[in-house]
Amino acid sequence: AVTYLAKENERIAFVSGPLVDDINGKVRLVGYKEALKKAGISYSEGLVFESKYTYEDGYALAERLISSNATAAVVTGDELAAGVLNGLADHGVSVPEEFEIITSDDSQVSRFTRPNLTTIAQPLYDLGAISMRMLTKIMHKEELEEREVLLPHGLTERRSTRKRK
């Protein structure tokens, strides 16, 4: 998501739920920092926003995003992103013309917003199935062949980002 946004933006915010969460907070923040570095963009703590995963928190964050001079955001939940989107609109900020948003759940919420949210599509069924198999092996004290599994994922371009050439 950051790599995509970095093609046309230098001030990319990271909007997340609690950063103490191992996966949703810590790991994603590390990925955000690494992607910024790879794109040649300096990390700024002032562009990291922590909240709850709620529409209301996203809406309230819009004003802080505007004040930060961010021009894009990676948001770690669709409901949170919908709040950001509507908060920006209510402050007169046009998405995607003035501000781009990419979210990460690909839930129905991302398709119901106007504009529709560009999102990272994740194979949630496969994620659950593989997790259950691994958990079952751990419970039966069986050896895990792999401790990390990378599942296919990709960007689903919708209308909260500008088209790239």
Model regions and ranges:
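Bacterial carbohydrate/catabolite-sensing allosteric modules
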Residues: A1-K165
